[in-house]
Amino acid sequence: MSTSDILESLIEKDNGYLITSKAVESGVSKPSVSKYVREHDMEKVAHGIYILDDVWPDELFVLQQRNKNIIYSGETAIYLHGLIDREYSHICFTVPTGYNATHIKKKNKEVRYANPEILDMGTCEIPSSSGNLVKVYDKERCICDLIKDRKKYEIQLYQTAIKEYMSSKKKNLSRLIEYAVKLGVRDEVMMYVEVMV
């Protein structure tokens, strides 16, 4: 397989993105990546990340490619799961406690911290609005976090997300209760389950 073939395969797999680190892992040298980028007039969207000229930048995908420790949570994850129809007002993500996120704490970004014991609980990959896979908390973890931090959310967003989840045929109540116990919100979650299901 030629260098061009390898890079084209990576670009196809990542929906028009060329990620230098993935190319290097596949055996392509950085100078070869740079040459390919120049020859194909690709646009740089972040350090080591390029896109074809007919691809819209996907902020969630790019941010996560640059920062592998982040997991989309809060309003961002709730929106991606379709529990609210209004797009998130800011990007919310969770990182391990002690992680230095000052390089990504910018406008419209909310950083949350979680202990290692619960950080990865309920993670999954789903498509962003642009169709790229991003790592987020599953619906059940989102609902537990929402209930735990209810004062941080607008009442309409809070109620809509809870109602959407509780009326969904794809909810997993045993998983919801398992997470609720681990996150210390079992009683609050059970109140919603008993009333709405």
Language-model-detected regions and their locations in the chain:
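Basic amphipathic alpha-helical segments that dock to polyanions
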Residues: 35-40
